[in-house]
């Protein structure tokens, strides 16, 4: 039995059902463990309460920061394959190219990721 954590959301139900079907077709029993937010799911993953976490980029960063050992991404939805990222800087900023970010701290995430 694989315990897969996810954040409970009506918009995620179709994805949850699709993942459950995918696992069952491969002979893997799946137990969904739903959380009210990404922080709770990250803590559960680090504690070993769930085997996998279904989250976005910021959820990954949260888990990676909490873990003392590396974690890895093992799957991505096909709808995310062609995603692009845009970096936007103020016109009066000294940032003109990605190289200008060297030595700076910044964060980004998708609008659907907490």
Feature names for model-found ranges:
Residues 63-75:
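Ligand-binding "clamshell"
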Residues 29-31, 72:
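Conserved beta-strand segments of alpha/beta enzyme cores
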Residues 74-84:
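Short Pro/Gly-enriched coil loops immediately N-terminal to beta-strands
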Residues 31-43, 96:
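Short helix-initiation/N-cap motifs at beta->coil->alpha
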Residues 2-26, 35, 83-114:
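Bilobed "Venus flytrap"/periplasmic-binding protein-like clamshell domains
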Residues 46-55, 69, 104-107:
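Alpha-to-beta junction loops
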Residues 40, 59-60:
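Alpha-helix capping/helix-boundary segments
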Residues 43-44, 62, 100:
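Well-formed, non-transmembrane alpha-helical positions, independent of function
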């Amino acid at each position: 039995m694989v315990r897969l954590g996810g954040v409970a959301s009506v918009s995620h139900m179709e994805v949850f059902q699709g993942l459950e079907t995918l696992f069952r077709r491969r002979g893997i029993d799946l137990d969904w463990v739903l959380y009210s937010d990404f922080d709770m799911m990250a803590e559960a993953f680090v504690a070993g309460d769930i085997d996998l976490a279904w989250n976005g980029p910021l959820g990954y960063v949260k888990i990676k920061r909490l873990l003392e050992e590396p974690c890895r991404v093992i799957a991505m939805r096909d709808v995310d394959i062609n995603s692009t990222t845009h970096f936007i800087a103020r016109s009066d900023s000294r940032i003109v190219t990605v190289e200008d970010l060297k030595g700076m701290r910044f964060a980004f995430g998708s609008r659907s990721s907490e």
